[in-house]
Amino acid sequence: MATTLTTDLRLSIAHQTRFGLRLASAISSDPESAATNVAFSPVSLHVALSLVAAGARGATRDQLVAVLGGGGAGEAEALQSLAEQVVQFVLADASINSGPRIAFANGVFVDASLSLKPSFQELAVCNYKSEVQSVDFKTKAPEAASQVNSWVKNVTAGLIEEILPAGSIDNTTRLVLGNALYFKGLWTKKFDESKTKYDDFHLLNGSTVQTPFMSSTNKQYLSSSDGLKVLKLPYQHGGDNRQFSMYILLPEAHDGLSRLAQKLSTEPDFLENRIPTEEVEVGQFMLPKFKISFGFEANKLLKTLGLQLPFSLEANLSEMVNSPMGLYISSVFHKTFVEVDEEGTKAGAATGDVIVDRSLPIRMDFVANHPFLFLIREDIAGVVLFIGHVANPAVSS
């Protein structure tokens, strides 16, 4: 993906980000989900559904385009172009060059009774780096599930062992999307493990739990406005133009998570206008360690965003298979893994330039001791890899 982005590509990325933020808002507004730790990858879901759009026609394709890309002439082609560039550049593993470890798995699994179109299979494999497999859902559903799970375990080198939970498919299943993304990066500034101490984290129900908090006296990228503090934690990058960062969005109100997610989804520039660009001196600084492994069936949430036809008998997936009568997406299964701890760069990698701050020193506290939202973004392109929230860091969900 070029460092200088075209206007059309920036617009496509903005649509992709808005899709993810709308999903995050839907998750946060659900009482059950709001009380648990959540993580999902809007970019990998977007890529998977863009592939479905390439195999769809008529009103089904129009609906996919409207939800994923905002509609308009040529938008279906823009979806495909964006997906290809994201898969090739943003989601490529960078660990060989000391960048983040990224493992992306995207699969389309169709019952063996259906004949896949060669053109769709070629598009999926070559342009989307996706797996397209014919499996026997009709007579061997458990074996088919095992086949899908083995695939995701293999693609993610064992980081994600299972994407289809037990009983999630049966002999009526015809088409399943499997989607997983793993990310593990090293901070450019390491947290000193000896400074990690247990303290109280305040839950949404008013109770507290003891959990380990990382702390630091280093300058941090911080911004504060309108009852929201935003922390930017850059990851060590490899030998390419990508720069990944984690953002912690901490509402001042202990119960402000749902309202924050709603603002992010309804105000297009809310996030961009609050991304910190300068390092500041910190006063009290506390960030909990957390580990989230989160899987869910995305159908219900996608329907709330207006994506109905691909999951119904009215679906038109005629560019995907021959004789597609009655074929629709049975399920979209999505799983992610996110881990935040003290790990930083290897010795000496972060030393070098000295930044001189000519303004008056301002110390800003950042104490993430209540529920907060986070995201991981590739900053050059603005592509959001993960969105999630931490409701209880003491639980490895």
From Swiss-Prot:
Tissues/organs with expression: Highly expressed in endosperm, at intermediate level in embryo and at lower levels in roots.
Marked site (Reactive bond) residue numbers: 358-359
Region described as RCL: spans on this chain: 344-368
InterPro entries attached to this UniProt entry: Serpin_CS, Serpin_dom, Serpin_fam, Serpin_sf, Serpin_sf_1, Serpin_sf_2
CDD domains, sorted: serpinP_plants (cd02043)
Modified residues (N-acetylalanine): 2
Assigned keywords, A-Z: Acetylation, Protease inhibitor, Serine protease inhibitor
GO molecular function, one term: serine-type endopeptidase inhibitor activity
Its biological purpose: Inhibits chymotrypsin in vitro.
Free-text domain note: The reactive center loop (RCL) extends out from the body of the protein and directs binding to the target protease. The protease cleaves the serpin at the reactive site within the RCL, establishing a covalent linkage between the carboxyl group of the serpin reactive site and the serine hydroxyl of the protease. The resulting inactive serpin-protease complex is highly stable.
Protein family: Belongs to the serpin family.
Official protein name in the record: Serpin-Z7
Organism, scientific name: Hordeum vulgare
Gene name tied to this protein: PAZ7
